[in-house]
Amino acid sequence: MESLYSQFAQVLERYYQSGTKIVLAFSGGVDSRLLLELLSRYQKAYSVDNQSTDSHSFKCHAVYVHHGLSSNADEWAGKCLVWAEQAGITCSVERVSLDTNSGESIELLAREARYQALAKHIQSGDLLLTGQHADDQVETFLLALKRGSGPKGLSSMAESMPFAGGTLVRPLLAIKREQIEAVAKEQGLDWVEDESNQDTRYDRNFLRHRIMPELSERWPSIHQAVQRSASLCAQQEALLDELLLAVFERALQSDFSLSIEELATHSELARARLVRMWLAKLNANMPTQVQLNLIWNEVALAQQDANPKLQLKQGEVRRFQNRLYWVTETVDVTTWQSAIQTDTALLLPEQLGELTLSTNSEQATIAMPPHPELLRVTFNPEGLSAHPTTRSHSRKLKKLFQEYNVPSWLRRQIPILMYQDKVVAVGNLFVDQAFSGQDCELIWRKSL
């Protein structure tokens, strides 16, 4: 236990900062069960080291995700709540439902739902601990190999990765399953055994029960070898990104679109990499090699009068004004509106960023109206007209969006600053002539 705790503490100390909340993905299986005990011990040690008897100064919380797939799930949730209470760690249960008729694998659906549920508990800077270990790493590597993945996929799992504004950390990634089980038994811990883990119809279980024992018996150092290969692949990926970073920054536009003109100056291999970097930045799933070719040949190079698009899993790649855009399904926000106060960031709906009417800007372009309390923000351009300072007369917003080259799918996603029934400014596009001045600036900070 001491050796394993020491490794756990070393990993945690690489990422933990005072005031950070730690969230444990707690399934009740042996991996997360042991993590709960390690986290509880770390919490107590932290309180002693910081001369505090208040264990809550070290903020941690466990989350059990109830998928509803097993008749035992309610019992498992109850056990997790009890174990967490005994460990002195708060715990909550998140219930999710899966669309088992979607055609997707149950494994993938459960994984996506699980991480969506966990993301609700993560705020900026928080840590999410998960229980993946060295055997999981080998399985992930072999599954990527089976899919024909390149270096990115073969990099498998990193010790840490960005997640929901915080960081996902895998403290047990260098530890074998047999060592985890041995320590758990040594400590007298109980844990849940998910019956689905024995079902070899699932690829990961097939590898775990049929393939891994054979590999480990033939090559006892297979775990270290796979970890080394995965690490080398990850290094190659990082090097490629580093070498192409300057090119990528030139191609990436302020609205997160990608310049086709810039892409066209590079080789096919470089173009494919730049598109992958772009989609990764936008948190989209990576396309296949076939899809990468389609993005270039059938979207980027389509006839100029065409409106090409390629549907991928989480959204679609579209072309507009010689740029590639990543378009996800959007929620209608045209009924949303809110008052706005000067020098106070207004959080916009559906991750559309934040809006600030700043009176401290050196680039002020707006005259403050006589009754600032009547200022409001809307997203509905229907029936509205405006007279931009750069235009000779007033026009409907629908026409102005066309003139300002705003893609059709973004026109109801741009915040409009209103004063009573008059348009003051539209996003970062223009200010109406009637409100032109030097009192304040409308600053729109967009989210990815």
Swiss-Prot record:
GO CC aspect terms: cytoplasm
Documented EC number(s): 6.3.4.19
GO biological process: tRNA modification
InterPro entries, alphabetized: Lysidine-tRNA-synth_C, Rossmann-like_a/b/a_fold, TilS/TtcA_N, tRNA_Ile_lys_synt, tRNA_Ile_lys_synt_N, tRNA_Ile_lys_synt_subst-bd
Annotated ATP binding sites: S27, G28, G29, V30, D31, S32
Keyword Oxidoreductase set for record: no
Domain of life, source organism: Bacteria
Comment text on domains: The N-terminal region contains the highly conserved SGGXDS motif, predicted to be a P-loop motif involved in ATP binding.
Role: Ligates lysine onto the cytidine present at position 34 of the AUA codon-specific tRNA(Ile) that contains the anticodon CAU, in an ATP-dependent manner. Cytidine is converted to lysidine, thus changing the amino acid specificity of the tRNA from methionine to isoleucine.
Similarity-based family: Belongs to the tRNA(Ile)-lysidine synthase family.
Protein name in UniProt: tRNA(Ile)-lysidine synthase
Organism expressing this protein natively: Vibrio campbellii (strain ATCC BAA-1116)
Higher taxonomy: Bacteria, Pseudomonadati, Pseudomonadota, Gammaproteobacteria, Vibrionales
